[in-house]
A protein has these predicted regions:
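Glycine/proline-enriched, intrinsically flexible loops and inter-domain linkers
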Residues: 1-203
Length: 203
């Protein structure tokens, strides 16, 4: 309930701003914020040496299969742009450890913002110089009906681990150890009494 009320208050404040300053002024301010974030991130990327960098991390298993779930990352830096490619990452799994595409993107940007320029405004402008490729059907970009109950709690770790490994080749003196390499979870399983389907939920 507190989160809902916070969102409603935020909505009210935004409406008040539009009523006070008008859409043109608000739009110009938003464009400026986006541009500022883009410029700062481009400057941060420019300070890194051009090249191609590789990293790999993994989850020990998916919960339903003992095989490791691999996350592979190829990062290319050219001037003020960066391309992050997760081709080679394991296909989506039957266990609840897949992560939706948007959560995987957050894992990439979280690390880049933290270590390249923590002062970059949190908006999409900072994304403009960064292209992220995540093949559909992988554990980082699954398709229906792949379970994604773990979302950012589980595969977020290997995504961040890959990005930290890449930055470790570029700015090792600025890095910490991995931010997280997994999470402790509670699993609940059973049968849906209305449909008879097997259920497995991860908390």
């Amino acid at each position: 309930m507190a989160q809902l009320q916070t969102a409603r208050l935020g909505e009210k404040r935004v409406i008040e701003l539009y009523e006070r300053y008008g859409p043109e002024t608000i739009g110009a301010c938003l464009s400026t914020y986006l541009h500022q974030a883009e410029v700062r991130m481009r400057n941060a990327i420019t300070a890194l040496p051009d090249g191609v960098y590789f990293a790999e991390d993994y989850l020990e298993n998916s919960g339903t299969n003992p095989d490791p779930v691999v996350v592979r990352c190829k990062t290319e830096i050219h001037g003020d742009t960066m391309n992050v490619d997760f081709t080679g990452t394991s296909p989506q799994v039957a266990g609840p450890t897949n992560t939706p595409y948007t959560c995987s993107l957050c894992g990439v940007f979280n690390v880049l913002k933290t270590f390249l320029d923590p002062g970059v405004l949190m908006n999409s402008g900072g994304w403009r110089p960064i292209n992220v490729e995540i093949p559909e059907g992988t554990t980082l970009n699954p398709t229906w009906p792949a379970p994604v109950c773990g979302v950012s709690d589980i595969m977020f770790g290997p995504v961040q681990g890959c990005m930290l490994a890449v930055l470790g080749q570029l700015i090792p003196d600025l890095l910490s150890a991995t931010l997280r390499s997994g999470a402790n979870q509670v699993n609940a399983s059973g049968t849906d009494p209305t449909k008879g389907n097997a259920l497995w939920h991860l908390f």
